[in-house]
Amino acid sequence: MSEDHGKDYTLEADSELRFEIEHKDAKVLVSLVSGFAELFGTELVKKKQYEFGVGAKVAIFTYQGCVLHVSGKMDVCYISKETPMVQYVNCHTALEQFRMEAEEKDRHGPVAMVVGPMDVGKSTLCRILLNYAVRVGRRPLYADLDVGQGSIAISGNVATILIERPANVEEGFSKTAPLVYHFGHKSPGANSILYNAVVSKMAEVTLHSLNSNKRTKSSGIIINTCGWVKGSGYAHLLHAAKAYGACAIFVLDQERLYNELLRDVPKGVHVVLLPKSGGVVERSKEQRHEARDQRVKEYFYGNARAPFYPFSFEVKFQDLRLYKIGAPPLPDSCMPLGMKAEDNKTKVVAVTPTPALIHHVLALSFSESVEDDVIGTNVAGFCCVTEVDMERQAVMLLSPQPRPLPPNALLLWSELQFMDNHT
């Protein structure tokens, strides 16, 4: 569908305008002409023009009715009156009740998890709940446990940020000063023991940090989770709920998961089944891969509105302190006395540079030694291996910071790869 000269869309109360952009060079401009509207919980400013590009899947909702002016090339564009936004705002109202009680009694605010299979709108619901909380003066923490399609850090990591202002309509939440823990894989199943250890550590630190500010303490935490909800994936959800002490679990679009959680979580935990929005779009494997790639590209190069200019520099093998968490499995009979096979899953092992290292993203740990708690230490940032020269015994790194690497820099291997073809 092509909208070359622009068009006004009149929305009735409790309806939303949905559109998708798939063409690479397409650009869609939206402005609020009259009334009130919001995008995933962020209010639109009247007469201000918002720009959306390729990959955008937008749903602009109005509680009272509005007129929107839209111009540009869209693949899909329609108005829907079937929207779960009223149920989502009811969830916010319930959480706000918990926050008011926590404020009165000087206790931790609610910890709410959003769970469900892939492509049901989990991160969107998190964004809505966080935006609504901020709009009534709260300062919640946002924890993202989705290592496949993270919304705070690049894939292969879990992360937490403090939300102090509503998400930017075009770019989402500010990613300033996130707390990031390295996992190194795109699925928890690659190393379940390590994933649980990393989640437990981040939960411990996040819950402790609630005490640093009275407003944050009563505001609580919103947690986004992976879309793997069966077998070991379900066990990871239970582990996260226990580690964070979740008091509410919002289940999107899966009755089976809802009933399993009702059966398995403590009686005091509120489990709520919610419908997914009709605007949620299923993504193919290729689209997921592209989204991961785009996140890494933005980490190093920024975007059109705020470009970054990363550095490339050489590091000799002898100066490279490179490790991987998790050693190949061994049978119990081959393990040292007192060690179990699963201990290998959290072992920090040295990595010898080879040409296979090219394109891999490496995490820079705040740990200075492998004697430290490497798993329980957050990371400072990331770099990418763009070249491996076996003859010169050196690697070329793409980094947001200029040379040299920090003294005692400890780099952690990740299975995430990024082809740096930026020109």
Swiss-Prot record:
Name of a matching Pfam family: CLP1_N
Entry keyword set: ATP-binding, mRNA processing, Nucleotide-binding, Nucleus
Subcellular location as annotated: Nucleus
InterPro entries: Clp1, Clp1/Grc3, Clp1_C, Clp1_C_sf, Clp1_N, Clp1_N_sf, CLP1_P, P-loop_NTPase
GO cellular component, one term: tRNA-intron endonuclease complex
Residues involved in ATP binding: E16, K57, D119, V120, G121, K122, S123, T124
Positions of transmembrane segments: none
Superkingdom assignment: Eukaryota
A GO MF term: polynucleotide 5'-hydroxyl-kinase activity
GO biological process, one term: mRNA 3'-end processing
Keyword Nucleotide-binding: yes
Sequence similarity: Belongs to the Clp1 family. Clp1 subfamily.
Summary of the function given for this chain in its UniProt record: Required for endonucleolytic cleavage during polyadenylation-dependent pre-mRNA 3'-end formation.
Protein name listed in UniProt: Protein CLP1 homolog
Gene: cbc
